[in-house]
A protein has these predicted regions:
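Core catalytic alpha/beta fold that binds nucleotide/phospho-ligands
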Residues: 1-166
């Protein structure tokens, strides 16, 4: 199936932002490519034929209604980033898809926190390099490093952890 115009635009804007971030990191753009894991998580790699073995930073890219967000982290760590419009309302019927037990009860009583929990869990899914193969209901945010903040009209969450640790 062909990608929609919107999807292509999101992809391209994310890649342009990633290029800027990689350039600001001080890496040569002509020697690096973006590859994907089996779960479609992006990562940087030296282009075949470039004889460098220094580790590359971990990366994550996200999109939201015309915005692109990107995060880089020092080698040896995994990172995930997610963003949503800060005024986006998560419908209460979606709460059971993203939380259970005490967390679900908290969400029901504090529905304004839903966007923070939603973006935090999406960031964790990306940092774990498992994407949607990690059920958000099974993510206990207390077990992860997550920072959330507002930038313009976006609510952004970033999660990171040591690569390969369980």
């Amino acid at each position: 199936p062909r990608a929609t115009q919107k999807r292509l635009k999101d992809h391209n804007s994310g890649r342009l932002l990633l290029e800027k971030c990689v350039e600001n990191w001080g890496l040569p753009l002509d020697s690096i490519e973006v590859l994907r894991t089996e779960h479609r998580a992006p990562y940087l790699s030296w282009i075949s034929g470039v004889w460098r073995n220094e580790p590359l930073p971990g990366i994550s890219i996200g999109h939201c209604e015309g915005w692109a967000v990107c995060a880089l982290v020092e080698p040896g760590y995994w990172i995930g980033i997610d963003a949503e419009k800060k005024n986006r309302q998560i419908q209460s019927n979606a709460f059971e898809m993203m939380a259970k037990g005490e967390e679900l009860n908290f969400l029901i009583e504090n529905s304004k926190m839903a966007i923070k929990i939603w973006t935090a869990k999406e960031a964790v899914q990306k940092a774990e390099k498992l994407g949607m193969h990690l059920n958000p209901r099974d993510i206990n945010l207390d077990n992860y490093k997550v920072e959330s903040f507002i930038h313009d009209d976006l609510f952004v969450s970033v999660s990171w952890r040591k690569a390969g640790e369980n």
